[in-house]
UniProtKB/Swiss-Prot annotation:
This is Phosphoglycolate phosphatase. Disulfide bonds: none annotated. Its cofactor is Mg(2+). Belongs to the archaeal SPP-like hydrolase family.
Length: 234
């Protein structure tokens, strides 16, 4: 039985320009009103996830930095990773690609569990340097940025740890996402929903694919879960 919903933010509850989609917010609040805690899961910074949690009104823990940080509305935080070899990678990348840029959240010192690079450099290039230097890192393209992190840091492990706070198992969670970095979440949860614009690799692992993209798809996914598991009448 599904007892909680975890959901990605960018591209899943937003418009393509990253503005919050009203239907998605309403669907999240409906789930919360029905007693289903919602966990926001994002590759973005903990500050971003905390603010979204407060403004949207979710009661579940938030999972930020691609699973590297778990937090709650009281702003308590648990760090599951650190920067590791990230700055070694960054130094080498800048030598070879001087136009490479970190995300703005890196510039402002908001991140603690990994490096985020703007998509001006192909993810294959980043992975190649990691392999060449034998660094203990992985690189994942979320569709919005390239996330470089320690191998144990991912959305799936973040969900596992967040579930302990809720007193449930990951198998009692339904996850909704739209990016390659949602694959690890799909591996641990009990039900998987991919939003329509998600890459094929994610859709192949989904139990359900929405007909609508972006925030409309996120809203559709939540309603689908609520109906499938008996929280709403069909």
């Amino acid at each position: 039985m599904i007892k909680a919903i975890s959901i990605d933010i960018d591209g899943t509850i937003t418009y393509p320009n990253r503005r919050l989609q009203e239907n998605a917010v309403e669907a999240i609040r409906l789930a919360e009103n029905l007693g289903i805690p919602v966990m926001l899961v994002t590759g973005n910074s903990a500050c971003f996830a905390y603010a979204a949690t407060i403004l949207i009104g979710t009661t579940g823990p938030f999972i930020a930095e691609d699973g590297g940080v778990i937090g709650d509305k009281s702003n308590n935080r648990i760090f599951l990773g650190d920067m590791g070899d990230s700055m070694i990678l960054w130094s080498e990348l800048k030598k070879r690609y001087p136009n490479a840029e970190m995300s703005d959240t890196m510039k402002y010192g908001e991140r603690r569990a990994g490096l985020v690079i703007k998509r001006t450099v192909p993810v294959e290039v980043v992975r190649g340097i990691i392999e060449e230097l034998n660094l203990d890192l992985i690189a994942v393209d979320s569709g919005y940025a390239i996330h470089v992190k320690q191998p144990h840091v991912n959305k799936g492990e973040g969900i596992r740890n967040a579930c302990q706070k809720l007193g449930i198992t990951p198998e009692q969670v339904a996850h909704i996402g739209d990016g390659e970095n949602d694959l690890d979440a799909f591996k641990v949860v009990g039900y998987r929903v991919a939003v329509a614009q998600a890459p094929e690799v994610l859709k192949r692992e989904a139990d359900h694919v929405t007909t609508k993209p972006y925030g409309d798809g996120g809203a559709e996914g939540i309603i689908h879960i609520l109906k499938k598991f008996g929280y709403l009448e069909i």
